[in-house]
Amino acid sequence: MRPDPDCRLCDLHRGRTNIVLPDGNPSHGIVFVGEGPGEFEDLEGRPFVGRSGKILDGMMKEAGFDRTKVMITNTVKCRPPNNRDPMPEEMAACRPFLESELYDARLVVGLGKSDCRDLMGYDGPMSEIVNIPMTIRIRDREIVFIPTYHPAATIYNKDSRAALQETMRVVAEWLK
């Protein structure tokens, strides 16, 4: 299921250039979920192509894999204004698209707080749940979910960088 190119399910459509669709390869059953597209993602129509994407790509490479082995998507498909976190009603509008992207996954990696709130209902500190495997329910399926920091958090926080590197090592093991 893909959003209509003229989607107007929430107010985010007003500021978008492009709907940002998933990127990568779903055949391995591993999906990274980010919060929302940024400026460069909105311009290109692909997730994680800006500064955070370069960090993510570098960490995947360090762990021995790349985008051709995973799928990358976001909780919302249009850029929130001023790069703010997506609002609950915006995530709810995109939820059917996200569920269809996650349905066949074996492992979902949540990159940041917004997707943890959306997929797990968790609104506490990320530090309490990072890299603790959990289970989420997508329709009638239970899927392993690993919450971790958004790549942007690693710019200013060494602890989040180490945690995200550990996440990538776990994903590399799942790919074996």
Question: How should these model regions be labeled?
Answer:
Residues 48-55, 90, 163:
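Short acidic-hydrophobic sequence patches enriched in Asp/Glu that either
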Residues 51-70:
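The first long alpha-helix at the start of the GST-like C-terminal all-alpha domain
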